[in-house]
Amino acid sequence: MNLLTVSTDLISIFLFTTLFLFFARKVAKKVGLVDKPNFRKRHQGLIPLVGGISVYAGICFTFGIVDYYIPHASLYLACAGVLVFIGALDDRFDISVKIRATIQAAVGIVMMVFGKLYLSSLGYIFGSWEMVLGPFGYFLTLFAVWAAINAFNMVDGIDGLLGGLSCVSFAAIGMILWFDGQTSLAIWCFAMIAAILPYIMLNLGILGRRYKVFMGDAGSTLIGFTVIWILLETTQGKTHPISPVTALWIIAIPLMDMVAIMYRRLRKGMSPFSPDRQHIHHLIMRAGFTSRQAFVLITLAAALLASIGVLAEYSHFVPEWVMLVLFLLAFFLYGYCIKRAWKVARFIKRVKRRLRRNRGGSPNLTK
């Protein structure tokens, strides 16, 4: 396998997904698979919800053109296909949370039974003692599947954010696997990025606002499920290339945001799935940043956290228990900012005003 072949495959995936996306958005408008504006959604017009369907089509295309072995490829496509189909039905008809959670659990069970993919160990997060899960690992795996799907679903609040965060996660996993010699799984991660990039271009309006599309629940479900599937492939077993604690850093922002928001809702006596405007992107936008600026800032923060995980994994210098402690400290800092969102927003606004005053009041230098 050489770089020219890999590059050619990735470009082919990108072009195929782009063409499929333009085709799918036309079909979506005819069948009513569109997002309509309401009091929580600020977009205008009917936006096709075909990002996830197009990404899935791109991955099917990937598995069709590549000639290297990807473990459990057929099983993954079947499981992911079911989730994308249910997600598309939810986008169109608004399926209840209980039905979706039941189907996600069923798919998780199929993954564990037929793919033998489940959490058997959490690594050496308590020092020299490996935390082996035993039968409890099956239940924790179902929770991990549900958590990953919902974590990526909840960050899909502003243009580009879901695509940006998912690309960060797949890039981090892909780099670790590539340098470890796990090229097949690494190419799968890079193929996910190639299939997501066309969606980001249309979602951000780079090719024109009239071509705008949304990912939809089908897309966020697919991305979350794919992330947890690849992490289970690579963090478990005797010769795993990624430590379980590194996975936390790779999906840090979506995971932190989900846990912090659900905890906040439960404390208020609300359903953990009830919508609100307390996510990290809402906090940043209340501080005076635009939607595009919030997207860039959050994606860069996710890339920074993922880089910490990648460097620690690659160097083998920092013990796993230390990485867990550092992650928990980062999480508590994140939770503190979310809990005091208005204070943080006011502080950032004051800093921005001072910077503008200092910039405006500085004397012009002349020769």
Curated annotation (Swiss-Prot):
- Per UniProt, what does mutating residue 90 to E/N do? Reduces slightly the velocity and shows a small increase of the affinity for the transferase
Q: Which UniProt keywords apply?
A: Cell inner membrane, Cell membrane, Glycosyltransferase, Lipopolysaccharide biosynthesis, Magnesium, Manganese, Membrane, Transferase, Transmembrane, Transmembrane helix
Q: Which reaction does it catalyse?
A: di-trans,octa-cis-undecaprenyl phosphate + UDP-N-acetyl-alpha-D-glucosamine = N-acetyl-alpha-D-glucosaminyl-di-trans,octa-cis-undecaprenyl diphosphate + UMP
Give residue spans on the Periplasmic membrane side. 1-2, 67-68, 127-131, 179-186, 234-241, 315-317
Its placement in the membrane is given as: Multi-pass membrane protein
In the record, the effect of residue 265 to K is given as: Decrease in activity. Reduces binding to tunicamycin
Q: Which cellular compartments is it found in?
A: Cell inner membrane
Q: Which residues lie on this side of the membrane: Cytoplasmic?
A: 24-45, 90-105, 153-157, 208-212, 263-293, 339-367
Q: Name the cofactor(s) required for activity, per the record.
A: Mg(2+); Mn(2+)
**Residues marked Could be required for catalysis (site):** 156, 159
Q: What is the effect of changing residue 91 to N?
A: Reduces slightly the velocity and shows a small increase of the affinity for the transferase
Which Gene Ontology BP terms does the record give?
cell wall macromolecule biosynthetic process; cell wall organization; enterobacterial common antigen biosynthetic process; lipopolysaccharide biosynthetic process; O antigen biosynthetic process
Important in orienting the substrate (site feature) positions = 90-91
* Residues forming coiled coils: none
- Enzymatic class: transferase
MF term (GO), any = phosphotransferase activity, for other substituted phosphate groups
Effect in UniProt of substituting residue 276 to G: No loss of activity; both in vivo and in vitro
Q: Which InterPro entries match?
A: ECA_WecA-rel (IPR012750), Glycosyl_transferase_4 (IPR000715)
This molecule's function is given as: Catalyzes the transfer of the GlcNAc-1-phosphate moiety from UDP-GlcNAc onto the carrier lipid undecaprenyl phosphate (C55-P), yielding GlcNAc-pyrophosphoryl-undecaprenyl (GlcNAc-PP-C55). It is the first lipid-linked intermediate involved in enterobacterial common antigen (ECA) synthesis, and an acceptor for the addition of subsequent sugars to complete the biosynthesis of O-antigen lipopolysaccharide (LPS) in many E.coli O types. The apparent affinity of WecA for the polyisoprenyl phosphate substrates increases with the polyisoprenyl chain length.
Matches recorded under PANTHER family: PHOSPHO-N-ACETYLMURAMOYL-PENTAPEPTIDE-TRANSFERASE (PTHR22926), UNDECAPRENYL-PHOSPHATE ALPHA-N-ACETYLGLUCOSAMINYL 1-PHOSPHATE TRANSFERASE (PTHR22926:SF3)
Report the sequence similarity comment from the record. Belongs to the glycosyltransferase 4 family. WecA subfamily.
Full protein name: Undecaprenyl-phosphate alpha-N-acetylglucosaminyl 1-phosphate transferase
Gene for this protein? Answer: wecA
